[in-house]
Amino acid sequence: MPFDMTVFLPLDPDAAFRLITEPERLRRWKTVAARVELRVGGEYRWTIVPGHSAAGTFTEIEPGKRVVLTWGWEGSPDLPPGASTVSITLDAVDGGTTVRLVHDGLTAEQAASHAQGWHHFLGRLVTLGVEGDVGPDEWAAVPDPIDPLASAEAALAIVQRVLRGVTAANAGAPTPCEDFTVTELVAHLLDSIARIGTALGVPEPAAPSSAAAASVPAEVRIADAAQKTLEALRLRGLAGTVDLGPGGLPASTAANILNLEFLVHAWDLATATGQQLEVAPALSDYILGLARQTITDATRGNGSFHPAIDVAESAASLPRLLAFTGRRNPS
Protein backbone atom coordinates (compact mmCIF):
# COMPACT_ATOMS: atom_id res chain seq x y z
CA MET A 1 0.00 0.00 0.00
CA PRO A 2 1.67 3.24 -1.12
CA PHE A 3 1.94 6.50 0.77
CA ASP A 4 1.77 9.57 -1.50
CA MET A 5 2.27 13.20 -0.44
CA THR A 6 3.18 16.42 -2.24
CA VAL A 7 4.47 19.65 -0.71
CA PHE A 8 5.57 22.99 -2.14
CA LEU A 9 8.93 24.65 -1.50
CA PRO A 10 9.67 28.28 -2.47
CA LEU A 11 13.02 27.13 -3.87
CA ASP A 12 14.32 26.17 -7.28
CA PRO A 13 14.57 22.42 -8.06
CA ASP A 14 18.35 22.30 -7.61
CA ALA A 15 18.11 23.80 -4.12
CA ALA A 16 15.28 21.41 -3.26
CA PHE A 17 17.34 18.47 -4.53
CA ARG A 18 20.22 19.44 -2.26
CA LEU A 19 17.88 19.50 0.74
CA ILE A 20 16.83 15.90 0.16
CA THR A 21 20.22 14.42 -0.73
CA GLU A 22 23.08 16.24 1.04
CA PRO A 23 23.97 15.18 4.61
CA GLU A 24 24.55 18.75 5.82
CA ARG A 25 21.07 19.75 4.66
CA LEU A 26 19.33 16.51 5.67
CA ARG A 27 20.49 17.15 9.24
CA ARG A 28 18.52 20.39 9.27
CA TRP A 29 15.10 18.78 8.82
CA LYS A 30 15.15 14.98 8.72
CA THR A 31 18.16 13.22 10.21
CA VAL A 32 20.40 13.26 13.24
CA ALA A 33 23.22 11.80 11.16
CA ALA A 34 23.50 10.87 7.50
CA ARG A 35 25.89 8.88 5.35
CA VAL A 36 25.17 9.32 1.63
CA GLU A 37 26.87 7.83 -1.42
CA LEU A 38 24.91 9.68 -4.08
CA ARG A 39 25.21 7.45 -7.14
CA VAL A 40 23.10 4.68 -8.60
CA GLY A 41 23.90 1.64 -6.49
CA GLY A 42 25.35 3.82 -3.75
CA GLU A 43 24.33 3.23 -0.16
CA TYR A 44 22.86 5.57 2.41
CA ARG A 45 22.29 5.34 6.15
CA TRP A 46 20.15 7.95 7.87
CA THR A 47 19.69 8.11 11.64
CA ILE A 48 16.17 9.51 11.55
CA VAL A 49 15.73 9.74 15.32
CA PRO A 50 18.12 8.49 18.00
CA GLY A 51 18.24 4.71 18.00
CA HIS A 52 16.42 4.30 14.68
CA SER A 53 18.29 4.31 11.35
CA ALA A 54 16.93 3.81 7.84
CA ALA A 55 19.19 2.34 5.17
CA GLY A 56 19.14 1.30 1.55
CA THR A 57 20.55 2.07 -1.89
CA PHE A 58 19.91 4.66 -4.58
CA THR A 59 18.33 3.15 -7.70
CA GLU A 60 17.62 6.30 -9.76
CA ILE A 61 19.17 9.76 -9.63
CA GLU A 62 18.33 12.75 -11.83
CA PRO A 63 19.85 15.84 -10.20
CA GLY A 64 17.24 18.52 -9.72
CA LYS A 65 14.45 16.21 -10.85
CA ARG A 66 14.15 12.82 -9.17
CA VAL A 67 15.71 10.38 -6.74
CA VAL A 68 14.58 6.82 -5.99
CA LEU A 69 15.94 4.75 -3.12
CA THR A 70 15.20 1.50 -1.39
CA TRP A 71 14.11 1.90 2.23
CA GLY A 72 14.05 -0.12 5.41
CA TRP A 73 15.05 -0.02 9.06
CA GLU A 74 18.17 -1.46 10.62
CA GLY A 75 17.26 -4.29 12.96
CA SER A 76 13.68 -4.56 11.72
CA PRO A 77 12.47 -8.07 10.84
CA ASP A 78 9.33 -6.67 9.20
CA LEU A 79 10.84 -3.88 7.07
CA PRO A 80 14.60 -4.44 6.79
CA PRO A 81 16.85 -2.22 4.64
CA GLY A 82 15.85 -2.49 0.99
CA ALA A 83 12.35 -3.86 1.65
CA SER A 84 10.43 -0.86 0.27
CA THR A 85 10.96 1.97 -2.20
CA VAL A 86 10.81 5.75 -1.80
CA SER A 87 10.51 7.93 -4.93
CA ILE A 88 10.89 11.70 -4.71
CA THR A 89 10.01 13.77 -7.79
CA LEU A 90 10.69 17.49 -8.14
CA ASP A 91 8.76 19.70 -10.55
CA ALA A 92 9.41 23.38 -11.18
CA VAL A 93 6.27 25.50 -10.78
CA ASP A 94 5.57 29.20 -10.42
CA GLY A 95 7.42 30.45 -7.37
CA GLY A 96 9.25 27.26 -6.54
CA THR A 97 9.16 23.47 -6.66
CA THR A 98 6.68 20.75 -5.82
CA VAL A 99 8.14 17.76 -4.01
CA ARG A 100 6.15 14.54 -4.44
CA LEU A 101 7.11 11.60 -2.23
CA VAL A 102 5.74 8.11 -2.90
CA HIS A 103 6.60 5.27 -0.53
CA ASP A 104 5.77 1.85 -2.09
CA GLY A 105 6.05 -1.70 -0.80
CA LEU A 106 4.38 -1.17 2.57
CA THR A 107 1.64 -3.11 4.29
CA ALA A 108 -1.40 -1.12 5.39
CA GLU A 109 -0.05 -1.00 8.94
CA GLN A 110 3.40 0.11 7.75
CA ALA A 111 1.87 2.75 5.49
CA ALA A 112 -0.07 4.20 8.42
CA SER A 113 2.98 4.44 10.66
CA HIS A 114 5.16 5.86 7.89
CA ALA A 115 2.44 8.38 6.99
CA GLN A 116 2.80 9.86 10.46
CA GLY A 117 6.55 10.10 9.99
CA TRP A 118 6.45 11.54 6.48
CA HIS A 119 3.86 14.17 7.48
CA HIS A 120 6.13 15.20 10.35
CA PHE A 121 9.32 15.41 8.34
CA LEU A 122 7.87 16.89 5.15
CA GLY A 123 6.28 19.53 7.36
CA ARG A 124 9.73 20.30 8.73
CA LEU A 125 11.09 20.44 5.17
CA VAL A 126 8.46 23.02 4.21
CA THR A 127 9.25 25.14 7.27
CA LEU A 128 12.95 24.98 6.44
CA GLY A 129 12.28 26.02 2.85
CA VAL A 130 10.09 28.95 3.90
CA GLU A 131 11.89 30.21 7.00
CA GLY A 132 15.46 28.97 6.55
CA ASP A 133 15.44 27.19 9.92
CA VAL A 134 13.09 24.66 11.45
CA GLY A 135 14.44 24.39 15.00
CA PRO A 136 15.26 21.24 16.94
CA ASP A 137 13.16 18.16 16.23
CA GLU A 138 11.11 17.19 19.28
CA TRP A 139 11.14 13.59 18.04
CA ALA A 140 14.91 13.51 18.58
CA ALA A 141 14.82 14.95 22.10
CA VAL A 142 14.58 11.72 24.12
CA PRO A 143 15.32 8.29 22.60
CA ASP A 144 12.72 5.55 22.99
CA PRO A 145 14.02 3.14 24.10
CA ILE A 146 17.05 4.85 25.62
CA ASP A 147 20.51 3.32 25.83
CA PRO A 148 24.06 4.75 25.71
CA LEU A 149 24.22 4.72 21.90
CA ALA A 150 20.78 6.25 21.37
CA SER A 151 21.46 8.91 24.00
CA ALA A 152 24.76 9.73 22.28
CA GLU A 153 22.85 10.27 19.03
CA ALA A 154 20.39 12.56 20.83
CA ALA A 155 23.28 14.52 22.36
CA LEU A 156 24.92 14.72 18.93
CA ALA A 157 21.78 16.36 17.53
CA ILE A 158 22.07 19.01 20.25
CA VAL A 159 25.74 19.83 19.73
CA GLN A 160 25.30 19.93 15.95
CA ARG A 161 22.64 22.60 16.29
CA VAL A 162 24.92 24.64 18.56
CA LEU A 163 27.80 24.24 16.11
CA ARG A 164 25.74 25.88 13.37
CA GLY A 165 26.04 29.03 15.46
CA VAL A 166 29.85 28.98 15.38
CA THR A 167 31.01 31.78 13.09
CA ALA A 168 34.19 33.64 12.27
CA ALA A 169 32.99 36.39 14.60
CA ASN A 170 32.85 34.14 17.69
CA ALA A 171 35.51 31.56 16.81
CA GLY A 172 38.05 33.21 19.11
CA ALA A 173 35.70 33.62 22.07
CA PRO A 174 36.73 32.01 25.37
CA THR A 175 34.78 28.97 26.58
CA PRO A 176 34.08 27.48 30.02
CA CYS A 177 36.86 24.99 29.20
CA GLU A 178 39.98 26.69 30.54
CA ASP A 179 42.48 27.78 27.89
CA PHE A 180 40.16 26.76 25.01
CA THR A 181 38.67 29.22 22.56
CA VAL A 182 35.66 28.14 20.52
CA THR A 183 37.94 27.07 17.65
CA GLU A 184 40.20 25.13 19.99
CA LEU A 185 37.28 23.42 21.70
CA VAL A 186 35.87 22.33 18.34
CA ALA A 187 39.30 20.88 17.50
CA HIS A 188 39.40 19.09 20.88
CA LEU A 189 35.93 17.63 20.31
CA LEU A 190 36.91 16.46 16.83
CA ASP A 191 40.06 14.83 18.21
CA SER A 192 38.11 13.04 20.95
CA ILE A 193 35.61 11.63 18.43
CA ALA A 194 38.37 10.65 16.00
CA ARG A 195 40.42 8.84 18.66
CA ILE A 196 37.47 6.64 19.58
CA GLY A 197 36.67 6.15 15.91
CA THR A 198 40.24 5.10 15.12
CA ALA A 199 40.09 2.52 17.92
CA LEU A 200 36.97 1.13 16.21
CA GLY A 201 38.66 0.91 12.82
CA VAL A 202 37.38 4.17 11.36
CA PRO A 203 40.09 5.70 9.12
CA GLU A 204 41.77 8.60 10.84
CA PRO A 205 40.67 11.94 9.38
CA ALA A 206 43.22 13.60 7.16
CA ALA A 207 44.88 16.60 8.77
CA PRO A 208 43.79 19.51 6.57
CA SER A 209 45.68 22.74 6.25
CA SER A 210 44.50 25.63 8.37
CA ALA A 211 42.95 27.26 5.30
CA ALA A 212 41.14 24.06 4.31
CA ALA A 213 39.86 23.48 7.85
CA ALA A 214 38.58 27.03 8.06
CA SER A 215 36.55 26.54 4.89
CA VAL A 216 34.59 23.58 6.33
CA PRO A 217 31.93 24.58 8.87
CA ALA A 218 32.48 23.27 12.38
CA GLU A 219 29.13 21.47 12.30
CA VAL A 220 30.12 19.54 9.18
CA ARG A 221 33.49 18.46 10.58
CA ILE A 222 32.01 17.21 13.84
CA ALA A 223 28.94 15.63 12.21
CA ASP A 224 30.99 13.68 9.65
CA ALA A 225 33.38 12.30 12.28
CA ALA A 226 30.61 11.51 14.75
CA GLN A 227 28.48 9.70 12.17
CA LYS A 228 31.32 7.35 11.30
CA THR A 229 32.27 6.71 14.92
CA LEU A 230 28.72 6.09 16.14
CA GLU A 231 27.92 3.80 13.22
CA ALA A 232 31.09 1.80 13.88
CA LEU A 233 30.32 1.55 17.60
CA ARG A 234 26.73 0.47 16.96
CA LEU A 235 27.93 -2.18 14.50
CA ARG A 236 30.53 -3.43 17.00
CA GLY A 237 28.32 -3.35 20.08
CA LEU A 238 29.17 -2.39 23.65
CA ALA A 239 30.57 -5.69 24.91
CA GLY A 240 34.30 -6.09 25.56
CA THR A 241 37.02 -3.50 25.11
CA VAL A 242 38.33 -1.29 22.33
CA ASP A 243 42.00 -0.61 21.66
CA LEU A 244 42.24 2.70 23.45
CA GLY A 245 44.66 3.38 26.29
CA PRO A 246 46.69 0.92 28.37
CA GLY A 247 44.83 -2.36 28.61
CA GLY A 248 42.02 -1.15 26.39
CA LEU A 249 38.84 0.74 27.21
CA PRO A 250 35.43 -0.88 27.75
CA ALA A 251 33.30 -0.19 24.69
CA SER A 252 30.49 0.89 27.00
CA THR A 253 32.80 3.52 28.50
CA ALA A 254 33.63 4.78 25.01
CA ALA A 255 29.90 5.29 24.44
CA ASN A 256 29.60 7.10 27.78
CA ILE A 257 32.49 9.39 26.85
CA LEU A 258 30.82 10.32 23.57
CA ASN A 259 27.65 11.24 25.47
CA LEU A 260 29.64 13.56 27.74
CA GLU A 261 31.70 15.04 24.92
CA PHE A 262 28.60 15.89 22.90
CA LEU A 263 26.33 17.24 25.63
CA VAL A 264 28.79 18.97 27.97
CA HIS A 265 30.68 20.61 25.12
CA ALA A 266 27.36 21.64 23.58
CA TRP A 267 26.80 23.64 26.76
CA ASP A 268 30.36 25.01 26.65
CA LEU A 269 29.95 26.15 23.05
CA ALA A 270 26.45 27.53 23.58
CA THR A 271 27.70 29.52 26.57
CA ALA A 272 30.66 30.86 24.61
CA THR A 273 28.58 31.89 21.60
CA GLY A 274 25.53 33.24 23.43
CA GLN A 275 23.11 30.52 22.37
CA GLN A 276 20.26 28.96 24.33
CA LEU A 277 20.74 25.24 24.93
CA GLU A 278 17.60 23.10 24.72
CA VAL A 279 17.96 19.71 26.44
CA ALA A 280 15.12 17.42 27.52
CA PRO A 281 15.43 16.72 31.26
CA ALA A 282 15.07 12.98 30.66
CA LEU A 283 18.12 13.04 28.40
CA SER A 284 20.35 15.07 30.71
CA ASP A 285 19.26 12.91 33.65
CA TYR A 286 20.22 9.75 31.77
CA ILE A 287 23.59 11.16 30.73
CA LEU A 288 24.21 12.26 34.33
CA GLY A 289 23.87 8.60 35.25
CA LEU A 290 26.45 7.69 32.60
CA ALA A 291 28.76 10.41 33.93
CA ARG A 292 28.59 8.93 37.42
CA GLN A 293 29.68 5.59 35.96
CA THR A 294 32.54 7.16 33.99
CA ILE A 295 34.12 10.06 35.88
CA THR A 296 36.31 8.75 38.69
CA ASP A 297 38.86 10.23 41.07
CA ALA A 298 41.52 9.04 38.62
CA THR A 299 40.00 10.91 35.67
CA ARG A 300 39.69 14.03 37.79
CA GLY A 301 43.27 13.59 38.98
CA ASN A 302 44.73 13.43 35.46
CA GLY A 303 43.11 16.73 34.54
CA SER A 304 40.32 15.38 32.35
CA PHE A 305 37.73 16.82 34.73
CA HIS A 306 37.79 19.35 37.54
CA PRO A 307 36.44 18.45 40.99
CA ALA A 308 32.67 18.34 41.16
CA ILE A 309 30.88 21.54 42.15
CA ASP A 310 28.32 21.40 44.94
CA VAL A 311 24.79 21.83 43.68
CA ALA A 312 21.45 21.08 45.27
CA GLU A 313 20.04 17.65 44.47
CA SER A 314 16.77 19.44 43.78
CA ALA A 315 18.41 21.28 40.87
CA ALA A 316 17.51 20.30 37.32
CA SER A 317 19.48 17.42 35.84
CA LEU A 318 21.48 19.50 33.33
CA PRO A 319 22.97 21.82 35.99
CA ARG A 320 23.69 18.74 38.12
CA LEU A 321 25.47 17.10 35.19
CA LEU A 322 27.51 20.22 34.50
CA ALA A 323 28.39 20.59 38.19
CA PHE A 324 29.46 16.93 38.32
CA THR A 325 31.89 17.57 35.47
CA GLY A 326 33.33 20.56 37.34
CA ARG A 327 31.75 23.34 35.31
CA ARG A 328 31.54 26.66 37.14
CA ASN A 329 28.19 28.46 37.28
CA PRO A 330 26.33 25.56 35.60
CA SER A 331 22.94 27.22 36.05
Indicate residue ranges for each PLM-predicted region:
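Hydrophobic/aromatic beta-strand elements that line small-molecule binding cavities or substrate pockets
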Residues: 7, 55-60, 84-91
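A short, structured loop/turn motif at beta-sheet edges
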Residues: 13-14, 59-65, 89-98
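Terminal, regulation- and interaction-focused segments at domain boundaries
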Residues: 1-14
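Beta-strand/loop substructures that line and gate deep hydrophobic ligand-binding cavities in soluble
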Residues: 75-127, 136-138
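Glycine-rich portal/gate segments that line the openings of hydrophobic small-molecule binding cavities
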Residues: 35-75
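Extended, alpha-helix-rich binding/interface surfaces that flank or overlap catalytic cores
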Residues: 185
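Structured surface interface patches that mediate subunit assembly and partner/cofactor docking
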Residues: 25-29, 35, 39, 43-46, ...
